[in-house]
Amino acid sequence: MTSLQAVTVPGIPTLTSGDDVAAVIAPHLAALTWPDASVGLRGDDIVVIAGKIVAKAQGRWHRAGEDPDGFRTRAGIPDQLGLKAPVDVKREAGQIRRGLAARFGGRPGVIISGSGRSCEPGRGVLDIALAAAGIDAKRQGGEAVIDAVAAAAGVMIAPDCPVVVVRGVADVLTWED
């Protein structure tokens, strides 16, 4: 790895229960324009997806104040609703990766990220990987790379832009989920 690039994916619509995440984001990935004027997703890119859109596709809505798990996400969520954390994220990451590989070829990596407050007061919010697919976590430093990529993308992820593509870390990709 000599350089790292990250680009937000504009135009992702709000997902609803039952949506296929890979199918919804694929047209936007295909139209993605990079700083060097290249277009689209390459088979050696990593797609970082906010866990919130996976939870929406899973229909994880609840009424505010009624979540028995005590977890809820608030950014970009109507006041009367809450959104539980996505479930079975490893399986979801694998399904999304396979869907993107079928559409774009190669072996794209997928990270489903989530954000939370730092333990240290005043340090703000940080993004971590909830799950990953197509990235070799077993190689030396693999898990650290996954969280570092999630954190880098987290700087760019926003309620209106929940997907970021990272280029430049192909050496950690694998054909396995």
Residue ranges and their predicted role:
Residues V39-V47:
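A short aromatic-anchored loop/beta-hairpin motif
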Residues D19-G40, A85-F104, P108:
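Phosphate-interacting basic helix/loop segments used at nucleotide- and nucleic-acid interfaces
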